[in-house]
Amino acid sequence: YDSIREIDNFTDNDNFENILINLICNKISFYIKLISPDTNVFIAFDGVAPVAKLEQQRNRRYKSVFEADILNKLTKQDIIKNNWNTSAITPGTKFMSKLSDKINKFFKNSNKFNVKKIITSTSNEIGEGEHKIYEFIRNNQEYHKTSTTVIYGLDADLIMLTLNHLHIAPSMFLFRETPHFIKTIDKTLEPNKNYIIDIPLFGKVLSLELNNNKEPDTKQKKNRIFDYIFLCFLLGNDFLPHFPALNIRTTGIDTILCVY
């Protein structure tokens, strides 16, 4: 979706898709070179999601089409820059098939990126991208106990998923850009800048605070982090709507932690 916003107006859908696919490959290449891993790279795209999530996605896509149409009619001008149907970014579509083929070919040669191995999991494989990554971590626990892992992604649930795996991989960090509206949330952050989120440090501070500022032992630290993740489910995630009385934008987290 970020790559779509970088492409100017167009008239030819086929040409647009080719430009988009090349842009995606180039952006992934840029991130690999920027982070500079020396062993493995895992590139994961969303495959078919669980049924509950599929229903949510379907509703969201229908709504976005109707909203765009209404917006154009109200303003009496074509304010939607691109008319390409973003529903094509769905497992099983012709576009995703083309993207999968290109990704597999483009990243076939790991030597080009100075790494030992590049693993690709495209939309042809079931499961959401982030879940594929963490499944790989769980299946290779010995390796991740002593290695540093950097995960790039914009989904908010990556923070919770990474916290949840700290007991398996104690040195995990999130790499992400800030969106253009970040100033409305935190004035200290700059839009479109790259940031590394130190998840081990976050987990350490979190477990200390939830343990009444008493240094937790290993079991307590693990349990406090799990408690925090569970409590945050009340604020909603990809699979659950937020609890009606709580909202993350209106001191929801502070309220929950105060009660805890």
Task: Label the model's feature ranges.
Residues 1-260:
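Noncatalytic, typically N-terminal accessory segments of nucleic acid-processing enzymes
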